[in-house]
Amino acid sequence: MFISYEQTEKEAQLFLKKYHSDFSAPVPIERIVEIDLQISIVPIKGLLARESIDAFLSHDFTELYIDHDHYMGQTNRSRFTLAHEVGHYVLHRAVVAQITSIEQWRRFILGQGTGRAVYEIHADNFAGCLLMPRDQIRAEYEIQKKTVEDRFRAAGLEIPDKSTLLSFMANEIARKFDVSPKAAEIRLSKISP
């Protein structure tokens, strides 16, 4: 099952409209998971080291297991992980409901030649769209683009190419949305003209 980036973004927008209708940043993903979706976040020590999995949902959607150290120590990364799992909840609910073991999760994530690894791409795209809503990220893009270009001009430097410009902008935008600079850069590359 392939879901386009545009469709994934639309699903994230509909989800936000229901659970965070003012679309303000940063999106309160932990509250949405625990209060609105009523999914308990369960940190597990050594999950990543033992199973090579950051997080996974229970098949009945009552618990979201996440690596303890990842959850407690890396806020922007754990926020993305929670949003990623919400992506599975929204986009792949029927498939996730059939997964009853950690081994099945591993096969789901890796694909094992079945083409299911595309689900991970969907969930990553959903997480980026959820945590950095389209209108808000576009507005911030315009602000940061002008700021960075003005800095280069003031220093007497040539305005860099688009890719380099996005890298410069990503740090500030990441802070606003409480995501990693890499997540911000990827999202910017999808929405910038």
Residue ranges and their predicted role:
Residues 1-193:
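Active-site hotspot residues in diverse enzymes, especially metal/ion-binding acidic/histidine motifs
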